[in-house]
């Protein structure tokens, strides 16, 4: 009788091993895009100059790099210097701060930092999708802090937001 239990146990374990070995769960981020890969293979992303009244030089470099990285990492498009199937260009048009919330003492307690980018998008395989549009993002910070102390972190967050908006409006069609 013991040998029947042993055979049943070994058979059950072998069955579990076979089921586990035949199942594979794959997790990861798949490229997110709704472009027709049979027609669209390349993208040209021009350098966006900073034409805002207030210029913070590191913002321009970070924005240009993050925008290119977004398309390289999340699509199969090849980045080319000119004449891409898709073309994106534009300029940073706004970088401003505004007093937002007034405290009981009559002074501002929060400051709103905004960034605005004008984008021109051309789809050379389907010109019905071409557009020119402004994208903006903002972050707030406590007015007791100096802008120079929080600027880099806030700019990174705004750039992430704006590059996602641009990506979604161009190739993700959201």
Which sequence ranges carry the predicted segments?
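Bacterial N-terminal signal peptides that target proteins for export
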Residues: 1-12
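A structural "domain/chain start" motif
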Residues: 2-3, 19-65, 69, 76, ...
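Bacterial N-terminal signal peptides
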Residues: 10-20
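Surface-exposed short loop/turn segments
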Residues: 31, 73-78, 85-130, 138-149, ...
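Conserved acidic
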Residues: 55, 59, 109, 150, ...
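Compositionally biased, intrinsically disordered linkers/stalks adjacent to structured regions
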Residues: 151-174
